[in-house]
């Protein structure tokens, strides 16, 4: 019965709370879109959130019953595709891989141009040029380049605060 489950959920809400919600994507289980691996940072973030004792802070500052929407929501995604919805959480941490031009000769196959979801790669002479303003650091162009003309440049994370929708919040 839906109503009974809803009552149990609402009655147990305060005992289920930790002061934060930490989610991550399925990237570590083999997602082909991974720009970086978040396996090592998720436990570290969880430890920091537990150490901060956000639940005690919420109990002191929130008048009335605590609800899940009071908790700090943090999500980690291994790529800008953001299947774990970091854009709509209080803190979103997105994996990023910026391409870098190497000394390897370009064969002009245009695989990098075709795979870029933002049309940030253009083929010029002598090879690909990445528009840094349009690039979302997904690393797809790096992954498909058969000659490694586009190699892995800077990798890391982009942090978004405040929760907004869209690929370009």
Predicted regions and their residues:
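Short, intrinsically disordered, charge-balanced linker/junction segments flanking boundaries
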Residues: 156-169
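Iron-sulfur cluster-binding cysteine motifs and their immediate structural context
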Residues: 90, 111-128, 140-158
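Small-residue-enriched alpha-helical segments and adjacent helix-cap loops
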Residues: 1-107, 115, 129-136, 165
């Amino acid at each position: 019965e839906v109503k009974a489950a809803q009552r149990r959920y609402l009655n147990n809400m305060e005992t289920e709370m930790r002061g934060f919600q930490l989610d991550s994507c399925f990237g570590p289980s083999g997602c082909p879109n991974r720009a970086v691996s978040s396996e090592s940072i998720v436990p570290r973030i969880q430890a920091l959130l537990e150490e901060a004792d956000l639940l005690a802070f919420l109990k002191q500052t929130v008048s009335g019953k605590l609800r899940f929407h009071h908790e700090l929501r943090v999500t980690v995604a291994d790529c800008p595709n953001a299947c774990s919805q970091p854009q709509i959480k209080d803190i979103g941490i997105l994996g990023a891989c910026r391409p870098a031009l190497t000394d390897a000769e370009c064969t002009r196959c245009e695989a990098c141009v075709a795979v870029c979801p933002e049309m940030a790669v253009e083929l010029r002479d002598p090879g690909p040029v990445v528009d840094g303003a349009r690039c979302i650091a997904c690393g797809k162009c790096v992954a498909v380049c058969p000659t490694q003309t586009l190699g892995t440049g800077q990798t890391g994370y982009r942090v978004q605060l405040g929760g907004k929708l869209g690929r370009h919040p």
